[in-house]
From Swiss-Prot:
Pfam families: fn2, Hemopexin, Peptidase_M10, PG_binding_1
Disulfide bonds: C234-C260, C248-C275, C292-C318, C306-C333, C350-C376, C364-C391, C470-C661
UniProt: Ca(2+) 3 binding residues: D186, G187, D209, E212
Keyword list, A-Z: Angiogenesis, Calcium, Collagen degradation, Disulfide bond, Extracellular matrix, Glycoprotein, Hydrolase, Membrane, Metal-binding, Metalloprotease, Nucleus, Phosphoprotein, Protease, Repeat, Secreted, Signal, Zinc, Zymogen
Collagen-binding: region residues: 223-397
UniProt: Zn(2+) 2 binding residues: H179, D181, H194, H207
Region (Collagenase-like 1) location: 111-222
UniProt similarity note: Belongs to the peptidase M10A family.
Protein name: 72 kDa type IV collagenase
Gene this chain is encoded by: MMP2
Amino acid sequence: MTEARVSRGALAALLRALCALGCLLGRAAAAPSPIIKFPGDVAPKTDKELAVQYLNTFYGCPKESCNLFVLKDTLKKMQKFFGLPQTGELDQSTIETMRKPRCGNPDVANYNFFPRKPKWDKNQITYRIIGYTPDLDPQTVDDAFARAFQVWSDVTPLRFSRIHDGEADIMINFGRWEHGDGYPFDGKDGLLAHAFAPGPGVGGDSHFDDDELRTLGEGQVVRVKYGNADGEYCKFPFRFNGKEYTSCTDTGRSDGFLWCSTTYNFDKDGKYGFCPHEALFTMGGNADGQPCKFPFRFQGTSYDSCTTEGRTDGYRWCGTTEDYDRDKEYGFCPETAMSTVGGNSEGAPCVLPFTFLGNKHESCTSAGRSDGKLWCATTSNYDDDRKWGFCPDQGYSLFLVAAHEFGHAMGLEHSQDPGALMAPIYTYTKNFRLSHDDIQGIQELYGASPDIDTGTGPTPTLGPVTPELCKQDIVFDGISQIRGEIFFFKDRFIWRTVTPRDKPTGPLLVATFWPELPEKIDAVYEDPQEEKAVFFAGNEYWVYSASTLERGYPKPLTSLGLPPGVQKVDAAFNWSKNKKTYIFAGDKFWRYNEVKKKMDPGFPKLIADAWNAIPDNLDAVVDLQGGGHSYFFKGAYYLKLENQSLKSVKFGSIKSDWLGC
């Protein structure tokens, strides 16, 4: 142990010396941090390794005989399932799909999970929660599961009741890697959960990977204790003494306890509580929530912090008296607002600041990594201790993942409809609604809810329907070229293509790329100078860098310079002719200067006075890069204008010319 520590210290000293030498040799250009191998990190699979494992797990391609011929054929099945071009090749879109987080159940029939289209032969179904995740307090977990069951009871005769002892129809638990059912999880990301079809034994049981960060989909959920806002949730970011905080802090306290504000402005409202910490309380165990007692003795060894010793599941625990060996009283340590995920620290919190390769880091960093993931050290000096973990991200909505898994527990298989809850890939949806495809599937098994009054008329269509490009005339909400691809927006769906000559692929959920957007947008354009996508919906707009929403958005249209009377934008585009952005609403348009970040004077103007033959109340406008033309869309048709002369050179059908129908 001493030799290893000396070796690491010597290595750290050498790295610091090299860093100092680099600074002396040339301060003009700071060298990027070298990519290193983090202890406990899982090495990423090659594309071929990923494909073989993916097709074996989800499409039944045997590992030992999944040769190139079989692989190609199975790849086409997978590509067809996800609406991808059926190339049979490991192209970029196929690999991207395989790397997305998803349910662990297969996409084709697997008789271990779904023997003979099973269903429950009763409408009263019981469930029991065996274990909890430390990421959320028990009340939030209970509520998420109850709401997930209600998704299905709202549209069927099924009724779900919770029991606290004995064998329930659906047993719910959290676990890591191999957890007792022969279908192991795979660490952070990848497989999120799985469930078995209705039946005896494990039938209906639902398991959730506890290496994932469980949230409600929008970052860590932190319910405070004590203070003057007991039981409320932290508000991140919050403002204290004129500074913004994005996590719990001990700033302003001398006792070291972490706290947060439950409103944005603590300076104004003064509402706060203490963040979960083992010094305040524990979860589960047998100590009824009593806090940890440090130091405590376990098997003759003294511990002054939470530990995973004595456990095979990796959960952090502590004794709640000074001698566990004598009293046998313990509890699990709650996750703090800066608890890490993955790494080699078993969920220990970040320690900020920390030293890495001789440099001090005041916040999470991607230094040293090739994948860009944010991480932190869990001691003050990574170079000496090499203890680390990934920083909390948005996490995975326990409600959405559970609602999907409980669909399997009712007998539903995966859906090819990307708008369905039962689609295999996880996509966070802020305003969730069960799709028509989901409702149709569950009602084929159990019938409609007796609470749904259909009256004497025809049965109504329940839930949103995923549109099909060539089977109906779609009036698009927006069309834009973003990062070189043409995107077509309709309600919560998008289609994408590189050129108008190719049939767009999709649909995909808008939330796949831009999760914070509302279900329906009014307009979209890309600022090519900054490569930012700007979306309009109602009287607000959103600005994204790639898939990251810029801080402070959405903002009102008035902050862009539009008058208060404009409550909706019809279309917008950045014109390559003069690099200005044009915003259309009704019969008027405005011109926005992207460099000066303000509207040009002399606007609005009437569309009819400035644009040749262009109608009012447009649906979308796009200027394709390097094409020399702009395209104005309304209804099922479009008008093509030559940029220099503003002459109309073509009037055509969107369906035939842009959608390949």
